[in-house]
Structures are given as C-alpha cells and as structure tokens.
Amino acid sequence: MLLKVDVLVSGTVPAILAAKQATKTTPIVMVTNVDPVATGLVDSFARPGGNITGLTRLTKDLNGKRLELFKELVPGMSHVGVLWETEAVVASIGPIGVKEYEAAAREMKIGFQSLEVSGHNPDFEGAFQAAAKGRVNALITVRTAVLNRYAKQIAELATKNRLPSMHEGSEHVEAGGLVSYAASPHESFRRAAYYVDRILKKGAKPADLPVETPTKFELVINLKTAKQIGLTIPESVLYRADRVIK
C-alpha cells in the first residue's frame, strides 16, 4: 500500500534518485554530497526546476581546501592516495573527486595516486598494497555509501599501515579515521526543515527555491588514531577543531 505524503526528505543519492523516479509531483527536499546539476537532479542552483530542491554539502574548491588542510596537519605528506569506488550509484562522484584532488596535489607539488575499489566487492587490502607500493604516505577517501559502510575496515587498514587519513564525513573519524573536514550533516538537515516549512506552510514550489550550499564546515580529529600512527597534530590545527575524539 502506497502512502500519500506531502513532502519527501532524503539524505542519500540512491534514495534521492529513487524518489525522483517514483514521483514527478511530490516535493522532494534533498541533502546531498554531490553536485546536483552535474548529476541531473536539478536544472540549476538558482532555478532547480522539477520537484527537487534542498542542499548540497559540496562547494567549489572544497576538495582543494581539504587537501591544503591535510597537508598542514601532516607536514611530511609527499604522496597522497585517493581511495574511491568505481561503481557508485552516481558514476561521476568518484572521477570528479579524483580529478579535483589530483589537480590540487599537482598545484601543491604533492605526488598523487588513484586507488580504485569495486563497489560490489571492494578489495581494500589490494588498494592499500598498491598504496604501499606507490609510496603513498597519506590517504583521502571519496565519500560514497559503500565506503561509508566499510568505514571501520578502512580506518583499521589505515592505522595498520600507519597512514594518516582524511575523510569527507565525520562518520569515518568516529570509526577510527584520523580527520574529516565537511559540512555538518546535523546543520544541513536542520536547514532542510526550512525548505519543508516553505513548501508546506507557504505553498512554495521546489522549482522556485534555490539549492543552497554550506557556509560552515566542521573539522573533526581523532587523537587516539593520531597516537596509534605516531602523528603529532600541530597545535595550529588542533586549536581550530570543532570536535576532538580522544
């Protein structure tokens, strides 16, 4: 039995795509990590068109800023590896992220290596072996549902290989990763309530409500992990942390 709803709120790309396929009329408020224009969710940020609007936690140059912060946290970084899923629901997520990190690494004169895993049967052991062979001494993960699901395993392998790891979501740091720099998911969903209010109480149409990008980002650091891999976090970075896990 299908329930009639007045508005849908969705926080993952697979769910947003499923909702979009299911209805062209029910308003959908998204909270996503991808570029909603590049992935075809909306027509534009200013005029979404259709029945979808909301927020994206992805902003211009965010990955470059993330790498700069990572380099400040790990001054000895000379070769960064980017771990990504080749079969994400939105196929462009991995390649776009990898391209942005590679460009930032080139600008900073840091070596770069792409570390791909299959979404259906991810071989993380193989990816870390490739990283070791390529002399990678710092790791970044591209956030997807599959990599989130294996956050603990990725963190354990990074610690085992004494690799500092930067993540695009704090759930990886809570699972044992070293650091994350990203928009707060809690703030994003609180802001999503604004869209729901405009749609339900003010009669606004999703097509006319601009998609927002975040203005505040959270830096989360796991000091326990830093100690396990023998890394001393610079005071200048630690002081700016929004949350520290001990």
What would you call each of these model-derived segments?
Residues 1-246:
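Short hydrophobic alpha-helices and adjacent helix-cap/hinge residues
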